[in-house]
Amino acid sequence: MYLINQNGWIEVICGSMFSGKSEELIRRVRRTQFAKQNAIVFKPCIDNRYSEEDVVSHNGMKVKAVPVSASKDIFKYVTEDMNVIAIDEVQFFDEDIVEVVQILANRGYRVIVAGLDQDFRGLPFGQVPQLMAIAEYVTKLQAVCSVCGSPASRTQRLINDEPAAFDDPIILVGASESYEPRCRHCHAVPTKQR
């Protein structure tokens, strides 16, 4: 998978909630550390579910991270001696994240991003589709549908144990109290045309 002769490329890890995106990002970062490469991890300030300064997977794996408010703030922390730049919850970053990732890869960094490819309505989420289009590698993970057990590619938002309506706010940071993985057929969004 990583037989590139030139330094600098983009990897996207995407999928529904509970599919293991953060876990996979952490795994890749740890592998770079075993290889004696310098890595730095970023997360959006909005993601404070489990920790302010760590990327934490739903199963408890974690790695230190720098929380940033804006995409271009990433440049303040990147130094020439680094090899790998990892960014979790990339869907929460502003539209500049695509340009930032491109610049970093063009400067020779291996850039690994992880995020939701669809919002709770089943529509493309934030800048993730653009990042998938420019990436050298895309890994799409699936969870297990909480209703029928099939592979889950969607994230169901629940409000009082009922599916959220199509016109509810797109961003609501949460975990299992607000979301569960669903397959195409068990995913429900009231007032959305099928």
From Swiss-Prot:
Reactions listed under catalytic activity: thymidine + ATP = dTMP + ADP + H(+)
UniProt binding sites for ATP: 15-22, 88-91
Record EC number: 2.7.1.21
InterPro entries hit by this protein: P-loop_NTPase, Thymidine_kinase, Thymidine_kinase_CS
EC top class, as a word: transferase
GO MF: ATP binding; thymidine kinase activity; zinc ion binding
Binding-site positions, Zn(2+): 145, 148, 183, 186
Keywords: ATP-binding, Cytoplasm, DNA synthesis, Kinase, Metal-binding, Nucleotide-binding, Transferase, Zinc
Active site annotation, chain numbering: 89 (proton acceptor)
BP GO annotations: DNA biosynthetic process; thymidine metabolic process
HAMAP family assigned: Thymidine_kinase (MF_00124)
Protein name: Thymidine kinase
Native organism taxonomy: Bacteria, Bacillati, Bacillota, Bacilli, Bacillales
